A protein has these predicted regions:
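Short active-site oxyanion
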Residues: 3-4, 44, 132-136
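A short, Trp-centered hydrophobic/proline-enriched beta-strand micro-motif
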Residues: 103-118, 154-158
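Generic beta-strand structural signal
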Residues: 49, 116, 130-131, 213
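A short mixed-secondary-structure module that forms the rim of ligand-binding clefts
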Residues: 36, 129-163
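Charged, gly/pro-rich active-site loop segments
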Residues: 42-43, 47-95, 168-239
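Hydrophobic residues embedded in beta-strands of well-ordered beta-sheets
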Residues: 54, 121, 135-136, 218
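Short, basic/aromatic recognition patches
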Residues: 87-111
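Short, charged N-terminal beta->alpha structural module
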Residues: 1-33
């Protein structure tokens, strides 16, 4: 695991907190308590205070210095630094990773679906089903559709109850929600896969809406992968 040390001046600690949380796998030190032994750290970031705002220097052999203008710019910079400092470790072959993700989804049936627009966000627990390898939810509606209709962007998570780091298992997904026309063949196939006939559907007090989740990025965290020589965190980017 690549650990990053962040050394900060007291007047710039909020910038350090933002960097440390977004980058991840960081340890933060006030300047007066900076470690003398750097052998346990793959990277170092210093955050100093100046009259014009925080000054950030990132890297060991190759250093980059910049002055973030505001918290939004700090967050954006932290995301880029995180990608540079924390490249994928011991990745699985793509086909093997796809099979692992498929097996994980087949072994579960409930996800947490996050949608949002502007400063408004919503996270809803939902049962899901898979039809021809695609991921769907059926729902009577609700505020989650506010975000779906606004921008379609979704994030979803499927996970086991925590029982220790060795057995830790969860899947984060990012993608787009697509509303399925209730008059389409696709809608009919999803309803039938759920075990509901159209005649039964017509007798229900409220309509069932079908939404397809087109996933562009999977992030699998599976502690059991270490036994096979792979990193616990694996990423499958389809976007």
């Amino acid at each position: 695991m690549n650990i990053t040390a962040i050394i900060y001046d007291a007047d710039a600690r909020r910038t350090a907190y933002i960097l440390g949380t977004v980058i991840g796998n960081c340890k933060l030190f006030p300047a007066e308590r900076a470690p003398r032994d750097w052998s346990g750290y793959a990277n170092v970031i210093t955050v100093t205070a100046s009259e014009d705002g925080p000054v950030v220097t990132a890297g060991l052999q190759k250093r980059v210095t910049f002055r973030p203008k505001g918290e939004d710019e700090t967050v954006a910079a932290a995301e880029l630094i995180g990608k540079a400092f924390c490249p994928p470790e011991a990745p699985m072959p793509t086909d093997a990773l796809k099979a692992r993700i498929d097996a994980f989804l087949e072994a579960h049936n409930t996800l947490a679906l996050a949608t949002g627009c502007g400063k408004w966000v919503r996270c809803t627990p939902l049962e899901y089903l898979r039809v021809d390898g695609r991921l769907y939810i059926l729902t009577e509606g609700g505020l989650k559709f506010k975000g779906i209709w606004w921008n379609g962007a979704i994030s979803a998570a499927v996970f086991d109850s925590y029982a220790g780091m060795a057995s830790l298992a969860g899947l984060q997904m990012t993608g787009t929600a697509v509303y399925i026309d209730p008059l389409s063949d696709e809608y009919r196939s999803v309803i039938e896969a759920r075990g509901v006939q159209l005649q039964q559907l017509q007798q229900m007090p409220a309509m069932l809406h079908a939404v397809r989740l087109d996933i562009t990025r999977y992030e699998l965290l599976d502690g059991a992968l270490r036994a096979d020589g792979y990193a616990a965190r694996q990423v499958l980017d389809l976007g």
